[in-house]
Amino acid sequence: RQRQMCIRDRAETPLHDIRLMMMRKFSDIPALTLTASIGHKLHMETVFKKYNPDYVFHAAAYKHVPMMEDNPGEAVINNIEGTRIIADLAVKYGVQKFVMVSTDKAVNPTNVMGCSKRICEMYCQSLNKAIVDGKVKGCTQFVTTRFGNVLGSNGSVIPIFKEQIKNGGPITVTHPDIIRYFMLIPEACRLVLQ
């Protein structure tokens, strides 16, 4: 079977940007870009059936804490239900490895977004254990990786800080004792691919 990369996102513009970047930098790797929501079960089933992926890197999520505090139902629908849909499909279609990108906010969560990601982690962990214990038929290995702040990524706090400094400050911090952990995009990529 020919290797190819299938990239799925529901945000059209970033998906188009990825397509152009892949053509420019990695023209030897066929890259399919599909606009779809992970919460759309029938569409996701079609994607898994048609492309039969060996690996799934699941980074889809609503991640802005204040937005999810105001829209908790969306955190449940997109983050939790979307994860359940594609994790179950990964098992059904024999994906070798399912890597879920989570957040440091899932550690002892104190907000809706962190809680939603912790539930996603728990679902993937329990599915992995059920496969290992023979309670669920499958071969998929589930792995979760947690990130803090990824410099240069969408939603990073750095652009907010830059804008606040440009406008004369002050810099907004959620708590004076908070410690923020940062990594670069290449470091995040290496962590996901381990």
Features from the language model and the residues they span:
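Helix N-cap at the beta1-alpha1 junction of Rossmann-like dinucleotide-binding domains, i.e.
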Residues: 11-14, 38
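Short, small-residue-biased leader/transition segments that mark boundaries at the very start
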Residues: 2-7
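Conserved residues in the N-terminal Rossmann fold of short-chain dehydrogenase/reductase
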Residues: 34-35, 77, 175
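A short helix-to-beta-strand connector/capping loop
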Residues: 26-31, 138-140
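Hydrophobic/aromatic anchor residues within beta-strands of the central parallel beta-sheet
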Residues: 33, 75, 98, 142-145
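NAD(P)-dependent short-chain dehydrogenase/reductase
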Residues: 88-91, 112-194
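Conserved Rossmann-fold NAD(P)-dependent oxidoreductase catalytic core, especially the SDR/UDP-sugar
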Residues: 58, 62-122, 126, 132
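Conserved Rossmann-fold cofactor-binding substructure of NAD(P)-dependent oxidoreductases
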Residues: 35-55
